[in-house]
Amino acid sequence: GFFYVSVFGQWEPSMQTLSLVLFTAPVCFIIGLSLGVWGYLSKRVEAALQPILNVAQTMPHFSYLVPIVVLFGVGDHAGSIATIIFATPPMVRLTILGLKKISPEVIESGLMSGCNRFQLLFKVLIPTARRDILIGVNQVIMQCLAMTTIAAFIGAKGLGFNLKVALNSLKIGKAAEIGICVVIIAVVLDKLSLAWANKQKDYFANLNFYQRNRLSIFFILLTVCCSVVAFIASYFFPEGFNYLYLIPFNKGLTVSPILDAFVDWIWNTFFYYLNSFNIFLLTNVLGPMKQAYLNMPVISTFVLFMGAGYIIGGLRSCLIVGSLILFIALSEYWDRTLITLYMATFAVGVSAISGIIVGSLCSQNDFASKSILSICDFFQTFP
């Protein structure tokens, strides 16, 4: 993966993006784990966290870029703050979910073993919920890298900024190259974090410091030697280009012309089929669905959603749903809200059906499940 990044001349922006992720991801993990544990221990805290998490996850990303720019200015620090706000909620939710799934027998066994509250939390509860917490770590890494392009709008450097420039110039092939670099970083970090979390400690006694850490010492020495070689090589490469240290952007390989030609071939070959599908989808599915939502009377919408809230959560949920819909109805964005609602309903329905079918089929085979998870990582991080 890093060979691809270096050969295609994206090493420097990739390291800028990697440094951003290596700062924001641990911060998101610590904040998310702490809030998740706090929410698990206190029902009031969980009730207070739920609306905050809902707002943080559903508010459009560009909406909170403006206050961040006003309060903190532009640059990498502003991009880091925006990324932390965007990537922390999944960690909080999955921590609470994982801790809630722990059976009472596990907690009772920990208490019977003499654990105090601190030991019960860190020696029993969190290790037992490790699977869900690791999913949260995966989502944090994916969300941090997915935010790189949006953070570039407020001055964050790295692959996101280069991608924004390529898209503004309609260079599809170059944008795809940069997007693949983002995916590579995401996959590498996800696999490393998963391997570190699943690594079993070596409890064999009578091992000295070197025997316990010989691999770490070897790779540290190898890294130092390679750094020295790269520094010395700068005196031998002509024109000042040290390819052992950094491959410049204009000296790297590129497949952007091939990717541009491939996109043009798809467009020229399948234009009529794609256009026919678009027309069918607009005229027979999305168009009628949009009109049905827009023609729905306001009072019927109130009754529908408040009734659903009452059935699911009782009178309290009914009143909350009704007050929120009333706020939208009194604003000037009722029709825009219905248009957004119809698009979200269609997208959620298609995503849920396809996700359940594909996930159920792939869960029957280890190879298929690993393959589909890699594909999911690709689509979650590809800008």
PLM feature segments, named:
Residues 159-196:
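Hydrophobic alpha-helical transmembrane segments of polytopic membrane proteins
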Residues 31-38, 42, 46-49, 78-81, ...:
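Membrane-embedded alpha-helices of multi-pass transport/permease systems
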Residues 91-137:
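Short cytoplasmic-facing helical segments at TM-TM junctions of multi-pass membrane proteins
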Residues 85, 118-150, 173, 177, ...:
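Transmembrane alpha-helices
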